[in-house]
Amino acid sequence: MAVRELKNFVNGQQVAASSGETSDVINPANAETYAKAAVSNASDVDSAYKAAQKAFEEWSQTTPSERQLALFRIADALEARAEEAADIESENTGKPRSTLVEYEIMPSIDQIRFFAGAAKNLEGRATA
């Protein structure tokens, strides 16, 4: 199996850590290295923070209906790739793949859809 390279996801782009440093990611079920992940430093965190701050400013201007639609699209995309998500999660956690779709992936999709419905109704209000 080829060892994958996992980069940081910043501002919609996959980017290596500025230091170029990586760390092995090991499947706990078989102790095999399946990926190398970027090891981020303060500069990388600052870049990610700035990108997230900008994205939040844009996201906060979306309507509840737009937010709902975005969450439904995320749920649909995850559902379409549920088997792939289960493979990745099994590799990452060592959990049996056979249980992941039914007991973790599909309930996660249900939660996203639940909160998509709530997004349209909350309209920025909060209760204590």
Residue spans for each PLM region:
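Terminal low-complexity tails and localization/encapsulation signals of metabolic enzymes
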Residues: 1-36, 69, 73, 122-128
